[in-house]
């Protein structure tokens, strides 16, 4: 049985988005391994405290990630 662990910075994704992640990740596993995997696929979402995550050696806060998302969406 697969266990898929997703780590996110807290506050970046809302509950609806996280639920969609779980559904989509499960569907991806089923697409790869077949329908019998649906009932045995575990998806765990762990939220990492803002500022306890780093990119390129620099800590990231929730606000930093939201600013990156806004820039990407504006492009």
Segment roles from a protein language model:
Residues 2-75:
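A domain-level signal for the structural core that forms small-molecule/cofactor-binding pockets
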């Amino acid at each position: 049985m697969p266990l898929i662990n997703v780590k996110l910075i807290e506050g970046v994704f809302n509950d609806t988005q996280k639920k969609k992640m779980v559904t989509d990740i499960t569907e991806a596993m089923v697409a790869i391994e077949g329908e019998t995997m649906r009932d045995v696929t575990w998806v765990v979402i762990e939220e990492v405290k803002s500022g306890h995550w780093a990119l390129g050696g620099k800590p990231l806060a929730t606000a930093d990630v939201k600013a990156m998302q806004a820039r990407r969406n504006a492009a």
